[in-house]
């Protein structure tokens, strides 16, 4: 299943699990899961709410990293190049395994793991998981973000290109949010006021 720009779907998997698929993301899964394991593949970003089944583990294959769960809520995101994978756990417990099926770490609620495929290195940080996965509810948050990061987020959400004059104090960080249902013009006005810059839409 491929989710086109501007849409987030909620396909019901064969076992009754739900998945919120972010725009421009792709999810692959069989019509029926095998009796011993439930395995899906993700490119992009998705949030999973997995139906518990201790005898049939649920595995998400994310290009070099697999996420193994029994029943839980979490998100998985792969970078465009496929060399970085992020996992955020909301409820339950998940284990992260590399391409050699070696367990790297177990995550607990409100933890985020960033895995770097090339050198098989990972970091784990404490986060506000509900806030970071709020995109599935149509809310886009950013915390301690640079102006460049905010611009990329707006461009990705609205599928537009923006230009702006870089401010003198380029080290500033910002926190804020916007709704995906808001008009782009409104979001640009709010962002300009917050950052003190002037974002211009490239036609």
Show the residue positions of the predicted features.
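A residue-level detector for the "anchor" residue at the start of short, highly conserved motifs
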Residues: 1-203
């Amino acid at each position: 299943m491929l989710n086109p720009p501007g849409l987030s779907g909620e396909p019901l998997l064969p076992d009754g699990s739900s998945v919120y698929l972010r725009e421009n993301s792709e999810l692959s899964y069989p019509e029926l899961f095998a009796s011993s394991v439930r395995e899906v593949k993700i490119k992009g970003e998705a949030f999973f709410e997995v139906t518990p089944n201790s005898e049939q583990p649920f595995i998400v294959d994310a290009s070099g990293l697999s996420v193994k769960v029994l029943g839980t809520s979490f998100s998985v995101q792969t970078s465009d190049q496929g060399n970085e994978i992020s996992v955020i756990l909301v409820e339950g417990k998940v284990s992260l395994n590399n391409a050699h099926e070696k367990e790297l770490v177990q995550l607990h609620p409100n933890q985020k793991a960033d895995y770097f495929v090339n050198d098989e290195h990972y970091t784990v940080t404490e986060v506000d998981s509900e806030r970071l996965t709020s995109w599935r509810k149509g809310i886009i948050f950013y915390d301690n973000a640079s102006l460049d990061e905010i611009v990329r987020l707006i461009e990705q959400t609205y599928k537009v290109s923006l230009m702006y004059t870089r401010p003198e104090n380029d080290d500033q960080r910002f926190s804020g949010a916007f709704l995906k249902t808001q008009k782009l013009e409104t979001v640009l006005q709010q962002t300009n006021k917050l950052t003190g810059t002037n974002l211009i839409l490239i036609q």
